[in-house]
């Protein structure tokens, strides 16, 4: 009774509809708790009946449904349930919540209904109640259209079909904007363990009908009219069938249900007549409410059986009245409330945490509560009588039973679990009641109510008691109570329910309202998109349910129902509950999911069945029923609920990635991170242990401190094979650190890094923890013989005179060498020594200077020494063993092996030496670079000495060539400069008289017809009738362009176009090439001025002209080289006497020797010619000269 009073107080607080939402949360929690206690008494049942008006439902329907958002009816519902469910006081929280919801509808009708609302805590806005009152006429008319459309169908529905229809209606209501009504329905009225099972059954069948008529809003009626919807039938058909079988009144209950449903449907479809009839049959809402209230005070005390007959009477009244009362909110609300109260007394608390305790019907009831369409009517229209009696009957009795089943489904869902937990206490009494009819009716009634317009969490909170108290009904109601079906978007089923006849009409007539910001939306997609801004549920209902479960862990927990219902108000203030939005991830839109059978009865509902694993086994019966679950948020735990949702999303989005590098964190020796010294994080060295500040150091001053080693910045034991990965700490003395097996993941030893004086001046006092040691790692200088060098004492400077110089004097310049004439003569000598005329390859200028030193400056004596093959030096001579570069002799076999090794291993002289074997690596290197220097073929640019680009290439090939050359113009210019720089700067050698080249007659002088084209390649002479044929033939010769001239026979002078030329130059210079085909347009022709070749692009001709310049340059260089070679040969012949004669070069003939730089122009041909000349003169060993095959080694791009 105290609880009832609290509920009454809550109801009174919520009596003002404005306060209804804020206070209902508190009231719901308290009411739920008290309802469990009072529900046993049974007085709570009467109170719920008394409240005829539900702010969320039209007054007619709301009267039938006791769904006060606040705690108005909670007290009465709870009282009745407490009376009946004394054993289920703890788990009866859910039942009480349901009862409270039904009572709230009764409470809405009158302040006397405040007691029922107390038992029934559900949050709703006053506006919703006002709307429900205002909707009495308008909504009834709206419902008329629905009733007219679906009247026949509703009449055709049997008791089982009625249950299914109720469930369908609840599902439709979930999908429709009246989701709040469904939620209210889902909030099964707390039914005390029915003292008399038959009375409960009688009441139950009556209640389902009036509950359906009164409890269901237009969407609910529509659902009822659509009994054919399979998903709505799920477990309800069986429960309805079972209702008559289970009790002595089961047959009557189904009949009454069918009749009552038909009446309700008729009344709903024919609101005016029904209202009149309701007015005739009904007792004024206030009277009915007062009666339930009066009954409730007495009923809470009397046993549930006494309350049940009263409730049966009230239900009978309401059964007759509710049929017409669908549009008459107050009478219907009163009857429905009374019937629901009676049902609650008759029906044991069906809300159990245990999934087994919850029958599928109960789970369906919960599913029906989320009806989105009902929410708008629930709020806007005066269908409260209808929704309220329907809610009371179906919600109280059926909702309890359905909660048993739904709670099974919800058991998987945390929200459902919370409801089940609260209903779990009531649930056992229901099972104990064992009234099949009542359970079936409860299932049927709960089917509709379990499609709560309010969030399932909120509805179940009211009925569920302490657990759902956490999920304050206000929290649910704010979601559900709003005229819009936003609360239902929170429930997947309501959103998932087909909008067909119901959803569309509901959406059209009722706007979806955001439960958080109260904004209205015309359709669910808009609402879903808006809900994302608040953080919506996951797109898929299953995901939402899972999230809801995670968000509301207390709800899914089945153990919660067994404990006594926690006081709902303490969990959250009514304002907080009313303001608590549904926890919905932003990424998940709220959708009305079509009901579909699933192992998780509330799988669709986010709150009821987030996951099958969370559901109790008994909830599996509800799998068939599609349940719209709105995550029930324990308002205090809402943020935590959101976190689980995020974690689930993160887990699903998680991609397997390789584990990151594990670097052990630095020792956490400083609890205050701000106090830690500045600078990089340091680790203990694994090679040397830092100086340990231990007592043993103070006691043993002789103990030598270990050397200071700067601590590493990276952990030496970090994962991976590092330099110190296998190093163990070596102990130093008894106080040394124990050795640790350093595995890749072994953290750095817990050593405290102390710094008595840090750079920033902050001194940190370090206190070692258990197992830690203080280590002084302050930078210091290691002192000792091992770390400091021994510096000798300063000596007298006079000691320098006694030191003897250990170097050998090799060269000392004389003052006479400063003479310019003498310098010139020395330069000439060095130039000769750098030529091939002297042994050593002409590169041994060092030997020349040594010889000149020995000759005391006499150039002629030095030159004579140089010309000797084997200079004899005494063993005592300081340079007796001195090796001069280029002085080694290489045999023919060695040169061949060297060439082969060089071609195989390039400049890897170690492998070259292994192949040559007779020479050292140093000799191989010296031989290579010596001859590279002599031959001057190691240039960076490409050499084109004997390669002449084919002038007869096709225009496309020339274009390609042009592009390539255009890409490397700078390279060409650089190479040209290099060539010029390498060309001897000394004056050109005097022209050597050579045989004038015999110029062959022009091609046309050969008697060939002018229209024929002859190939001028050597040993060829093929004649072609067209230039294209000749060009094609020229490709056969490819890069084998051979120079027709004899070596050294071509003068340095530039050849004229008319003269014989190499390659195809003569062909191009012939008149035939200068003529063009008559078909060619002269404006698009670009002929070559040199050879007459015609091009169709100026770029092609420009590229072609480069070939002429290159050919000319190459020919000029060849001529110069040949002339120089001939000059050198003639000079050597003149300067050398007869074989074996020791003659010396006259001093006046030194000017004839070309300076060393002139050697740059030497090539293979010159070297070979010089080799032949020198062989004849027997001046130098030819072993130092390269053979023809050796010259290949020194060509190409090799660099010095």
Curated annotation (Swiss-Prot):
The modification N6-acetyllysine is found at residues 633, 640. The modification Phosphoserine is found at residues 491, 955. Highest expression was seen in thymus, testis and adrenal cortex, expressed also in the adrenal medulla, thyroid, and stomach. Highly expressed in steroidogenic JEG-3 and MCF-7 cells, low expression was seen in non-steroidogenic Hep-G2 and HEK293 cells. A zinc finger (C2H2-type) spans 512-534, 1013-1037, 1086-1108. Residues 407-420, 439-448, 464-473, 599-608 have a biased composition (Polar residues). Residues 779-870 form the ELM2 domain. This is Transcriptional-regulating factor 1. The gene is TRERF1.
């Amino acid at each position: 009774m105290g609880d009832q009073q609290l509920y009454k107080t809550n109801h009174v607080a919520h009596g003002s509809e404005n306060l209804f939402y804020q206070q209902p949360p508190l009231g719901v929690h308290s009411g739920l708790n008290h309802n469990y206690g009072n529900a046993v008494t049974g007085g709570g049942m009467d109170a719920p009946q008394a409240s005829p008006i539900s702010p969320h439902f039209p007054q007619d329907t709301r009267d039938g449904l006791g769904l006060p958002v606040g705690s108005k009816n909670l007290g009465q519902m709870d009282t009745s349930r407490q009376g009946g469910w004394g054993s289920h006081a703890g788990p009866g929280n859910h039942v009480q919540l349901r009862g409270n919801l039904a009572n709230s509808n009764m409470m809405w009708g009158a302040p006397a209904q405040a007691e029922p609302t107390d038992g029934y805590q559900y949050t709703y806005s006053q506006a919703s109640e006002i709307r429900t009152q205002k909707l009495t006429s308008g909504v009834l008319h709206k419902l008329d259209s629905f009733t007219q459309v679906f009247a026949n169908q509703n009449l055709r529905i049997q008791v089982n079909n009625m249950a299914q229809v109720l469930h369908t209606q609840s599902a439709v209501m979930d999908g429709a904007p009246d989701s709040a009504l469904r939620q209210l329905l889902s909030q099964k009225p707390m039914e005390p363990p029915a003292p008399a099972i038959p009375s409960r059954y009688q009441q139950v069948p009556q209640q389902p009908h009036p509950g359906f008529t009164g409890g269901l809003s237009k969407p609910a009626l529509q659902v009822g009219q659509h009994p054919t919807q399979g998903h709505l039938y799920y477990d309800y058909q069986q429960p309805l069938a079972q209702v008559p079988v289970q009790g002595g009144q089961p047959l009557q209950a189904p009949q009454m249900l069918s009749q009552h449903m038909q009446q309700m449907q008729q009344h709903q479809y024919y609101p005016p007549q029904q209202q009149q009839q309701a007015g005739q049959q009904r007792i004024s809402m206030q009277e009915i409410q007062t009666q339930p209230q009066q009954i409730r005070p007495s009923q809470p005390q009397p046993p549930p059986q006494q309350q049940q007959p009263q409730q049966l009477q009230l239900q009978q009244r309401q059964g007759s009245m509710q049929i017409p009362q669908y549009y008459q909110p107050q009478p219907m609300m009163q009857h429905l409330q009374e019937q629901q109260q009676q049902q609650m007394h008759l029906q044991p608390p069906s809300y159990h945490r245990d999934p087994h305790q919850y029958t599928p019907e109960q789970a369906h009831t919960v599913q029906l509560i989320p009806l989105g369409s009902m929410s708008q009517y629930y709020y806007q229209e005066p269908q409260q009588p209808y929704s309220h009696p329907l809610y009371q009957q179906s919600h109280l009795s059926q909702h309890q039973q359905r909660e048993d089943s739904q709670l099974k489904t919800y058991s998987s869902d945390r929200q459902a679990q919370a409801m089940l937990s609260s209903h779990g206490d009531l649930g056992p009494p229901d099972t104990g009641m064992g009234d099949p009819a009542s359970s079936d009716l409860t299932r049927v009634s709960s089917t509709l109510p379990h499609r709560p317009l309010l969030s399932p969490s909120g509805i179940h909170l009211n009925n569920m008691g302490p657990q759902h108290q956490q999920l304050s009904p206000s929290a649910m109601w704010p979601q559900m109570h709003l005229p819009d079906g936003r609360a239902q978007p929170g429930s997947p089923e309501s959103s998932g329910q087909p909008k067909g006849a119901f959803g569309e009409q509901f959406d059209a007539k009722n706007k979806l309202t955001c439960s958080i910001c109260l904004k209205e939306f015309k359709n669910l997609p808009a609402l879903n998109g808006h809900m994302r801004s608040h953080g919506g549920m996951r797109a898929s209902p299953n995901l939402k349910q899972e999230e809801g479960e995670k968000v509301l862990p207390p709800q899914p927990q089945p153990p919660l129902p067994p404990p006594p219902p926690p006081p709902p108000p303490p969990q959250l203030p009514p304002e907080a509950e009313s303001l608590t939005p549904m926890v919905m991830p932003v990424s998940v839109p709220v959708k009305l999911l079509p009901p579909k059978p699933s192992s998780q009865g509330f799988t669709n509902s986010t709150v009821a069945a987030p996951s099958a694993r969370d559901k109790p086994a008994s909830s599996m019966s509800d799998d068939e029923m599609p349940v719209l679950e709105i995550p029930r948020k324990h308002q205090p735990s809402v943020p935590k609920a959101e976190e689980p949702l995020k974690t689930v999303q993160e887990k699903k989005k998680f991609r397997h990635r390789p584990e990151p590098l594990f670097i052990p964190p630095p020792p956490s020796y400083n609890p205050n991170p701000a106090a830690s010294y500045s600078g990089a994080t340091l680790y203990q060295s694994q090679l040397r242990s830092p100086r340990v500040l231990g007592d043993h150091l103070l006691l043993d001053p002789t103990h030598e401190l270990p050397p200071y080693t700067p601590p590493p910045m990276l952990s030496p034991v970090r994962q991976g094979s590092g330099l110190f990965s296998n190093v163990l700490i070596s102990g130093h003395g008894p106080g040394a650190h124990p050795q640790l097996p350093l595995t890749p993941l072994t953290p750095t030893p817990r050593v405290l890094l102390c710094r008595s004086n840090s750079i920033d001046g902050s001194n940190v006092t370090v206190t070692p923890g258990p197992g830690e040691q203080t280590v002084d790692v302050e930078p210091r200088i290691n002192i000792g013989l091992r770390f400091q060098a021994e510096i000798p004492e300063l000596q007298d400077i006079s000691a320098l005179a006694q030191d003897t110089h250990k170097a050998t004097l090799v060269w000392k310049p004389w003052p006479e060498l400063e003479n310019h004439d003498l310098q010139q003569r020395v330069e000439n000598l060095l130039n000769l020594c750098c030529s091939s005329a002297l042994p050593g390859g002409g590169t041994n200028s060092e030997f020349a200077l040594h010889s000149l030193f020995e000759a005391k400056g006499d150039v002629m004596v030095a030159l004579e020494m140089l010309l000797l093959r084997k200079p004899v030096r005494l063993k005592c001579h300081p340079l007796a063993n001195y090796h001069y570069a280029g002085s080694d002799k290489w045999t023919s076999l060695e040169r061949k092996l060297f060439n082969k090794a060089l071609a195989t291993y390039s400049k890897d002289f170690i492998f070259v030496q292994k192949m040559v074997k007779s020479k050292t690596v140093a000799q191989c290197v010296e031989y290579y670079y010596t001859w590279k220097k002599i031959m001057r073929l190691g240039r960076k640019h490409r050499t084109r000495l004997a390669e002449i680009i084919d002038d007869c290439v096709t225009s496309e090939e020339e274009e390609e060539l042009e592009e390539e050359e255009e890409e490397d113009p700078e390279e060409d210019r650089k190479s040209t400069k290099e060539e010029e720089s390498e060309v001897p700067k000394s004056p050109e050698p005097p022209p050597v008289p050579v045989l004038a080249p015999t110029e062959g007659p022009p091609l046309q002088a050969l008697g060939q017809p002018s229209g024929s084209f002859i190939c001028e390649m050597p040993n060829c002479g093929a004649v072609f009738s067209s230039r294209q044929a000749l060009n094609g033939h020229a490709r056969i010769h490819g890069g084998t362009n051979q120079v027709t001239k004899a070596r050294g026979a071509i003068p340095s002078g530039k050849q004229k176009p008319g003269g014989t030329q190499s390659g195809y130059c003569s062909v191009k210079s012939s008149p035939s090439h200068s003529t063009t085909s008559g078909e060619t347009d002269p404006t698009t022709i670009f002929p070559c001025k040199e050879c007459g070749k015609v091009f169709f692009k100026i770029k092609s001709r420009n590229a072609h002209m480069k070939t002429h310049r290159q050919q000319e340059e190459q020919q000029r260089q060849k001529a110069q080289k040949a002339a120089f070679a001939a000059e050198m040969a003639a000079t050597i012949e003149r300067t050398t006497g007869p074989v074996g004669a020791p003659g010396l070069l006259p001093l006046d003939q030194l000017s004839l020797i070309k300076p060393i730089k002139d050697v740059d122009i030497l090539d293979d041909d010159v070297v070979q010619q010089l080799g032949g000349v020198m062989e004849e003169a027997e001046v130098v060993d030819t072993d130092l000269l390269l053979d023809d095959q050796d010259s290949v080694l020194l060509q190409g791009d090799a660099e010095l």
